[in-house]
Curated annotation (Swiss-Prot):
The chain crosses the membrane at residues 5-25, 30-50. It comes from the Bacteria. One of its GO terms (cellular component) is plasma membrane. This is UPF0391 membrane protein Rmet_0093. It holds the Pfam family DUF1328. Keywords: Cell membrane, Membrane, Transmembrane, Transmembrane helix. It comes from Cupriavidus metallidurans (strain ATCC 43123 / DSM 2839 / NBRC 102507 / CH34) (Ralstonia metallidurans). It is found in: Cell membrane. The keyword Transferase does not apply. It is a multi-pass membrane protein. Belongs to the UPF0391 family. InterPro entries: DUF1328.
Length: 54
């Protein structure tokens, strides 16, 4: 589970670079939304991995 949390976090960072960096000017809003979605998924997956280990 922690592997997936890391993957989702990396995807969120990539979406943030495109959305907040202005690289993809036409898709800024979509990249910002994807950043938030993948950041939430990464946090949830990380917490589930920690809970499952106990």
């Amino acid at each position: 589970m922690l592997y997936y949390a890391l993957v989702f976090f990396i995807v969120a960072l990539i979406a943030a670079i495109f959305g907040f960096g202005g690289i993809a000017a036409g898709a800024v809003e979509i990249a910002k939304i994807l950043f938030l979605i993948f950041l939430v998924v990464a946090i949830v997956t990380f917490v589930m991995g920690l809970v499952r280990r106990r």
